Amino acid sequence: MNKLLITLITFIFLFIYPTSNILANEKGLGVCPQERKTKKAPRIIYRSKNPLEYSSKNIKEGKLIYEKTARPLQCVLCHGIKGNGIGDPDFESTPSARNFTCAQTMTQVPDGQLYWIIKNGSTGTSM
């Protein structure tokens, strides 16, 4: 897997997702749960696990990618600073951006599938 994508996945699962039980219950924090019909990743990718360990270095690198260096657009623009799917109103889309703080949704998305979506986009969405 591409190191930048792996670092971004690590940031999402280790920094944003652990707050999901708290954030998902607050009002105005994105659609939860979210239905998607995203194409399933090839089996070998779908079953792959995030190889990066939980560390402050990996979280810091993932946060930098999420907020500043991802291209063509930074993830934060659509997914929001809290990862709740509420980003810059100029980048709103239908369907709305994935709410990473929604445990009901994110527990159903394996590491490999998330990697596949970040790398290849998701048909019918802004990614």
Please tell me what each predicted stretch does:
Residues M1-L8:
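Bacterial N-terminal signal peptides that target proteins for export
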Residues K60-L64, V76, G112, W116:
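Solvent-exposed, polar/charged alpha-helical surfaces in well-ordered, non-transmembrane soluble domains
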Residues E35-K68:
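Electrostatic cytochrome c docking/interface patches
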Residues A24-P33, T94, R98-N99, I117-M127:
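Axial heme c-ligation environment in periplasmic c-type cytochrome domains
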Residues P18-A24:
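Sec/Tat signal peptide C-region and signal peptidase I cleavage site
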Residues S56-K57, G80-Y115:
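Gly/Gly-Pro-rich "capping" loops immediately C-terminal to redox-active cysteine motifs
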Residues G62, A70-K82:
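The canonical Cys-X-X-Cys-His
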Residues L8-Y17:
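Bacterial N-terminal signal peptides
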